[in-house]
Swiss-Prot record:
The lineage of its organism: Eukaryota, Viridiplantae, Streptophyta, Embryophyta, Tracheophyta. Binds 1 Fe cation per subunit. Residues 251-264 have a biased composition (Basic and acidic residues). It comes from Pisum sativum (Garden pea). Disulfide bonds: none annotated. This is Seed linoleate 9S-lipoxygenase-2. It catalyses: (9Z,12Z)-octadecadienoate + O2 = (9S)-hydroperoxy-(10E,12Z)-octadecadienoate. Plant lipoxygenase may be involved in a number of diverse aspects of plant physiology including growth and development, pest resistance, and senescence or responses to wounding. It catalyzes the hydroperoxidation of lipids containing a cis,cis-1,4-pentadiene structure.
Length: 864
């Protein structure tokens, strides 16, 4: 609380302030490149275009263009609200400040203030210009009896006539609702109401309203029945997390579906509008959809390049020699810098991709069984392997609907290095990568398209030296007599010579196709992007910016998270979008993720709980973090537990500063409304599940916040930034399969005998879809130059609480220690899974990174 300052401030005192802002100096993506007839016009080299006609430099802010009014935190008016000071306008431009970042400008301002106004705790700002600007901060200096007061703003400010209520910002001090200075209470409540809106009307791009809706905008039925998609969310058939509401008009053919939009609404402060380079990465995805894919289609339509790879070297030529494209096709590629960097043409007709890490040392190590197994522990999808506790593996599919789906793998065929099946099970040495239940319900429909695939089960054995090896793969299909008749399957065993080795290589490819699709749609999109969005919405609607939990969680939401998800709905997961065009499930892709969401459990997103549930760890008080890993050399789990524990310790330290007892948590009205809304609205289709924490205790609050931070930072990093390093070689991570295993006596079988490479390439992702896939995942795998990583804050003055700042510094120091520790582990030759045959050290959970394609770094938020 502020001290009593009656009589301590002199009448007529002036408070000096500094306002830092950024001009709107970059055109929107749709202005940078206008799309017409598949071509791109208005190409600009830099991707940045200063709006000189709208803003005449910094002088536009002077005069009477922008005004501020201080609001007292200690003195109330007749209505019980903090007194409001006089309108004060920006003054001269400061030539330089040591703390200014790129593109930032600072202005002087002097406020008239006296003892009757008390101490400022908030301010109004009004923009009288026709163009918006990005307000970074206000700093008040030498406030009598108080010193410096800082306001961290980070918000777009539009012309004041566009707002129903004045724009208000609060000082960087945290208050629980019950501790808010009485003059600020109504301001706090009114700002939350503004952010909630009234749930009606179409949202305008300048608005800051957060609300919920179902995923009813993925299809485009007005353009054809083939583009209609089921609504996800709001039903037991297709449950889903909620997205941000836009209020767009319905389609003509389906009144429950929304029309696609040229530019999808997200609350304005969720989109930095290209002030951040991460936005250029994000809009690179849109560029791939609108510019790059049509360019590739043109090249293939002209038969300029065949749609098949004929050898593995053909695939590697994407990175080595490049592929030829017509000059007019090259010229239509997007002007965005990130796209130019990915598609290196050197002014010629040759298009090259960056060599992916997986083949930078060895061109063929990806083919080994050791690497195939290792990537289940240290690859881009390391959270799916499970410890096997019974044999044969059973199914959780409803037998009344699907019949018996117990695995048909026989014990007799497994090479367990002399162990019996009972010994292997009892000693925790059998593992499974099981996609059977996920794919079987959709496989009949998938295989009616041009795609052909299996539902796979892979059995693995932990050898005496601590490394993992595959011992059998089961390839399953729905029974030809109907779903209730069960399934048919082939069991493929390891082989290293003859046609059997080709069949084994193909079997591994079918497994990876399952894994690639599950990874992109479930491990990545659903389990990080989609499930976090309701938390973002609820936090902005129910937790004031001065609430300590808002300050804790905000950096793990900000930058571009909701904007990224909106772009995904627009270009990636939409009907005929990039995912449908290049991944096996095609039109059933997101529907499959809804089927998986039915079994999503919030508390299982805690890494220790996840490892225990997957039988990859057991509780053991004598082991680090109270868990003993069944595979000691499990890089994702080992590194992840270090990061998880550091996050949890930081959350405990921080939360303890504001909540002395469990009753403080129970009585926090904003916190309780927040959690109620997360459960009942944001994840409303699962609201009746018994596993939701009640949020009544300190431990529950710590666990909830730790899960949110872990999911938005480390988990997303683990499943995102390895996509191109591993998947940039389509041979290693194919995204679809086009034919089943050739049967003996067929022409395809004879081809397989003659050329294993051609048989493999005719089965997996063809060239056109490969180019789409690589274009997308190279962007997704990059870090922006202004990325903010775990243990960092964009503004060092994010809070005025010195104890919170000390705890955060402790967290940052711990992460630096962890990074050094993980580096040492990667240098230990006994930890084989950390590097593997491809000689790619596991660094995805190293907290820090440089810009670009680095295979490391944990950003604070889902920023790509």
């Amino acid at each position: 609380m502020f001290p009593n300052v009656t009589g301590l401030l002199n009448k007529g005192h002036k408070i000096r302030g500094t306002v830092v802002l950024m001009r709107k100096n970059v055109l929107d993506f749709n202005t940078i490149v206008s799309i017409g007839g598949g071509n791109v016009h208005g190409v600009i080299d830099s991707g940045i275009n200063i709006i000189g006609s709208t803003l005449d430099g910094l002088t536009a802010f002077l005069g009477r263009s922008v005004s501020l009014q201080l609001i007292s935190a200690t003195k109330s008016d007749a209505n019980g609200k903090g007194k409001v000071g006089k309108d004060t306008f920006l003054e001269g431009v400061l030539a330089s400040l040591p703390t200014l970042g790129a593109g930032e400008s600072a202005f002087n301002i002097h406020f008239e203030w006296d003892h009757e106004m008390g101490i400022p705790g908030a301010f109004y700002i009004k923009n009288y210009m026709q163009v918006e600007f990005f307000l970074k901060s206000l700093t008040l200096e030498d406030v009598p009896n108080h010193g410096t007061i800082r306001f961290v703003c980070n918000s777009w400010v539009y012309n004041s006539k566009l707002y129903k209520s004045p724009r208000i910002f609060f000082a960087n001090k945290s208050y629980l609702p019950s501790e808010t200075p009485s003059p600020l209470v109504k301001y706090r409540e009114e700002e939350l109401q503004t952010l909630r809106g009234d749930g009606t009307g179409e949202r305008k791009l300048h608005e800051r309203i957060y609300d919920y809706d179902v995923y009813n905008d993925l299809g485009n039925p007005d353009h054809g029945e083939h583009l209609a998609r089921p609504i996800l969310g709001g039903s037991s058939t297709h449950p889903y997390p909620r997205r941000g509401r836009t209020g767009r008009y319905p389609t003509r053919k389906d009144p429950n579906s929304e029309k696609p939009a040229t530019e999808t609404y997200v609350p304005r402060d969720e989109n930095f509008g290209h002030l951040k380079s991460s936005d250029f990465l994000a809009y690179g995805i849109k560029s791939v959809s609108q510019c790059v894919v049509p360019a590739f289609e043109s090249a293939f339509d002209l038969n300029f390049t065949p749609n098949e790879f004929d050898s593995f070297q053909d695939v590697r030529n994407l990175f080595e020699g490049g592929i030829k494209l017509p000059l007019d096709v090259i010229s239509t590629l997007s002007p965005l810098p990130v796209v130019k960097e990915i598609f290196r043409t050197d002014g010629e007709q040759v298009l090259k991709f960056t060599p992916p890490h997986v083949i930078r040392v060895s061109k063929s190590a990806w083919m080994t069984d050791e690497e195939f197994a290792r990537e289940m522990l240290a690859g881009v999808n390391p959270c799916m392997i499970r410890g096997l506790q019974e044999f044969p593996p059973k199914s959780n599919l409803d037998p009344a609907e699907y019949g018996d789906h117990t695995s048909k793998i026989s014990v007799d065929v497994l090479n367990l290095d002399g162990c019996t099946i009972d010994e292997a099970l009892a000693s925790g040495r059998l593992f499974i990568l099981d996609y059977h239940d996920t794919f079987i319900p959709f496989l009949r429909r998938i295989n009616e398209t041009s795609a052909k695939a299996y539902a796979t089960r892979t059995i693995l054995f932990l050898k005496e030296n601590g490394t993992l090896k595959p011992v059998a793969i089961e390839l399953s299909l729905p029974h030809p007599d109907g779903d209730k008749s069960g399934f048919v399957s082939k069991v493929i065993l390891p082989a290293d010579e003859g046609v059997e080795s080709t069949i084994w290589l193909l079997a591994k490819a079918y497994v990876v196709v399952n894994d690639s699709c599950y990874h992109q749609l479930m491990s990545h999109w659903l389990n990080t992007h989609a499930v976090i969005e309701p938390f973002v919405i609820a936090t902005n609607r129910q937790l004031s910016v001065v609430h300590p939990i808002n300050k804790l969680l905000a950096p793990h939401y900000r930058d571009t998270m909701m904007n990224i998800n909106a772009l995904a709905r627009d270009s990636l997961i939409n009907a005929n979008g990039l995912i449908e065009r290049s991944f096996l499930p095609s039109k059933y892709a997101v529907e499959m993720s809804s089927a998986v969401y039915k079994y999503w459990v919030f508390t299982d997103q805690a890494l220790p709980n996840d490892l225990i549930k997957r039988n990859m760890a057991v509780k053991d008080s004598s082991s680090p973090y109270g868990l003993r890993l069944l595979i000691e050399d499990y890089p994702y789990a080992v590194d992840g537990l270090e990061i998880w524990t550091a996050i949890k310790t930081w959350v405990q330290d921080y939360v303890s500063l504001y909540y002395a007892t469990d009753n403080d948590i129970k009585n926090d009205s904003e916190l309780q409304h927040w959690w109620k809304e997360v459960v009942e609205k944001g994840h409303g289709d699962l609201k009746d599940k018994p596993w939701w924490p009640k949020l009544q205790t300190f431990d529950e609050l710590v666990e909830v916040c730790t899960i949110i931070i872990w999911t938005a930072s480390a988990l997303h990093a683990a499943v995102n930034f390895g996509q191109y390093p591993y998947g940039g070689l389509i041979l290693n991570r194919p995204t679809l399969s086009r034919r089943l295993l050739p049967e003996e006596g067929t022409a395809e079988y004879d081809e397989m005998v003659k050329s294993s490479q051609k048989a493999y390439l005719r089965t997996i992702t063809p060239k056109f879809q490969t180019l789409i896939d690589l274009s997308v995942i190279e962007i997704l795998s990059r870090h922006a130059s202004d990325e903010v990583y775990l243990g960092q804050r964009e503004n060092p003055h994010w809070t005025s609480d010195s104890k919170a700042l000390q705890a955060f510094q402790k967290f940052g120091n711990k992460l630096a220690e962890i990074e050094a520790k993980l580096t040492n582990k990667n240098n230990d030759p006994s930890l084989y899974h950390r590097v593997g045959p491809v000689q790619l050290p596991y660094t995805l959970l190293h907290p820090s990174s440089k810009e670009g394609l680095t295979f490391r770094g944990i950003p604070n938020s889902i920023s790509i």
